[in-house]
């Protein structure tokens, strides 16, 4: 169909891949032409008449034609696929692999929208890195010191391969800290914000939802009203960033298409701010953001298929 753009997903079995398929199905300008999964090969793709999952290796991908290829693969698995995709095809990589690379465009539209228009190689941001950057970006010029971030996510962030961080028995009535130093999303946020920061993630027994609490040292005293005004101004035209007068909770982010930012508090001396950001780790933290990036790369209205 000439008025629609074709999209293929490699790694469609995972939680993010499944959300991508659902969003593509509902998008008026996109057509899903293949969905790759070794485990689901031969099964019908939900919401698609006549389309079945296929096992697509890099050689197999070279035989397909699509305007966009989304790689929803584990870290380190995507480059053989990137190597067979021509320069005229948009590649959106969900993994960490290219988030620090200068020759890929970093896909956080609220901060880097103009670079994403017409881009052909897009590194989709990580879920924690998205929330962290949305929470810190309006304060970059005011920070004096190292912000400290506490992150909590539902266990879907650990993927579908069984392990300690998605084991329901271990997670029951529990909170699991992991990767206490040098988490990839910390490196990513540091790189693209241009700020040092410290971040520790934790897994929660909920399936989805993500929360980041940021403690931010400031170079001069600031009132709560000024703090809130910075965020109101920065995100006034951003439909996927909701500024809240309340303290966001993890459950508020679950199922939400964007990021909820709130909890604005200030220490008595006005030099330490607290900001909280909540999102759905599978949506704005992955699939929704990928759809924004696809739209921008193709010249489609950015929020088509997402809002309205």
Q: Language-model segments: what does each one mean?
A:
Residues 1-178, 265-269, 304:
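N-terminal Rossmann-like NAD(P) cofactor-binding subdomain of oxidoreductases
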Residues 6-9, 123, 213-215, 275-278:
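Short glycine-rich or small-residue beta-strand-to-loop segments that form or flank ligand, phosphate
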Residues 15-18, 22, 27-60, 155-276:
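C-terminal substrate-binding/catalytic lobe of Rossmann-fold NAD(P)-dependent oxidoreductases
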Residues 131, 223, 285-286:
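Secondary-structure boundary/capping motif
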Residues 136, 186, 291:
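Generic structural marker for isolated residues within well-ordered, non-membrane alpha-helices
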Residues 138-142, 217, 293-300:
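Active-site catalytic microenvironments for nucleophilic, acid-base chemistry
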Residues 251-308:
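C-terminal helical cap and adjacent loop that interface with cofactors, partners, or active-site loops
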């Amino acid at each position: 169909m000439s008025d629609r753009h074709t999209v293929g997903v490699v790694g469609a079995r995972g939680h993010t891949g499944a959300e991508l398929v659902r969003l593509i199905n509902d998008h008026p300008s996109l057509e899903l032409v293949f969905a790759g999964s070794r485990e689901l090969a031969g099964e019908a793709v939900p919401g698609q008449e006549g389309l079945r999952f296929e096992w697509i290796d890099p050689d197999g991908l070279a035989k397909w034609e699509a305007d966009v290829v989304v790689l929803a693969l584990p870290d380190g698995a995507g480059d053989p696929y990137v190597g067979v995709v021509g320069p005229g095809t948009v590649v959106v990589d969900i993994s960490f692999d290219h988030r620090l690379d200068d020759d890929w465009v970093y896909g956080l539209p609220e901060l880097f929208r103009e670079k994403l228009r017409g881009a052909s190689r897009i590194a989709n941001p990580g879920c924690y890195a998205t929330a962290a950057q949305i929470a810190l970006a309006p304060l970059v010029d005011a920070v004096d010191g190292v912000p400290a971030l506490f992150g909590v996510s539902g266990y879907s962030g650990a993927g579908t391969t069984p392990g300690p961080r998605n084991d329901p028995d271990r997670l029951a009535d529990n909170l699991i800290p992991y990767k206490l130093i040098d988490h990839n999303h910390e490196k990513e946020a540091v790189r693209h914000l241009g700020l040092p920061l410290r971040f520790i993630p934790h897994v929660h027994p909920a399936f989805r939802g993500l929360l980041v609490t940021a403690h931010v040292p400031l170079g001069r005293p600031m009132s709560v009203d000024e703090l809130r005004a910075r965020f109101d101004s920065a995100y006034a035209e951003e439909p996927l960033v909701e500024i809240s007068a309340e303290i966001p909770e993890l459950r508020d982010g679950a199922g939400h298409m964007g990021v909820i930012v709130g909890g604005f508090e200030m220490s008595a001396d006005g030099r330490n701010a607290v900001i909280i950001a909540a999102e759905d780790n599978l949506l704005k933290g992955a699939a929704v953001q990928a759809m924004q990036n696809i739209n921008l790369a193709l010249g489609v209205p950015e929020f088509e298929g997402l809002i309205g």
